[in-house]
């Protein structure tokens, strides 16, 4: 990446999901598992990148969905059912788990070489949704630990991020041409 390039000529493979061989431990994915991390808000993307990358700039681009996806929304948690509603009382434990887990997702984790331990609970739940859930889940939405914005993680590696005209059966996201930018942080 060149520092002076305000509109670089990136391709989906170079700015989408990190290849598995280079994928480090992240909030939702263990080292070696590639996933697409994004946000609809550039400020949130910059806040997330700034937390672990010391460079004074960041490369960003817009992607669009090629097909509908199903995501588990942990960014907006349900209200606790009333203790006086016998029809919904059985949901209390589940709702409390979702609310507690969502709060855990929003806690900062120190990048001290032991982050893989702090990330383990969220990675386990992500792997459940990705591989074992009877639901057909493509990703998760969650709140940024850095600015409260909405983040998305989609369960796809570089093969799921394509350039216009490069659509494949595995593709989920298409790079919007001309949207690539290098921004100061």
Predicted regions and their residues:
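Active-site and NAD+-binding cores of ADP-ribose-processing enzymes
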Residues: 1-29, 52-185
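Conserved structured core elements
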Residues: 39-43, 119
């Amino acid at each position: 990446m060149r520092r002076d390039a305000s509109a670089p000529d990136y391709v989906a493979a170079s700015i989408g999901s990190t290849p598995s061989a280079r994928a480090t431990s992240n909030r939702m994915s263990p080292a070696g598992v590639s996933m697409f991390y994004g946000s609809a808000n550039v400020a949130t993307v910059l806040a997330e990148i700034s937390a672990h990358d010391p460079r004074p700039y960041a490369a960003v681009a817009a992607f669009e969905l090629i097909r509908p996806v199903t995501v588990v929304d942990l960014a907006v948690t349900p209200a606790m059912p009333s203790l006086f509603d016998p029809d919904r009382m059985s949901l209390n434990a589940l709702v409390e788990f979702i609310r507690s887990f969502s709060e855990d997702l929003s806690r900062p984790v120190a990048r001290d070489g032991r982050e893989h331990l702090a990330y383990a609970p969220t990675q386990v739940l992500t792997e459940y949704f990705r591989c074992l859930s009877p639901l057909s889940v493509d990703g998760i939405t969650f709140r940024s630990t850095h600015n409260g914005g909405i983040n998305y993680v989609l369960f796809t590696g570089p093969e799921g991020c394509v350039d216009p005209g490069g659509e494949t059966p595995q593709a989920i996201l298409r790079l919007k041409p001309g949207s690539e930018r290098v921004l100061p942080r």
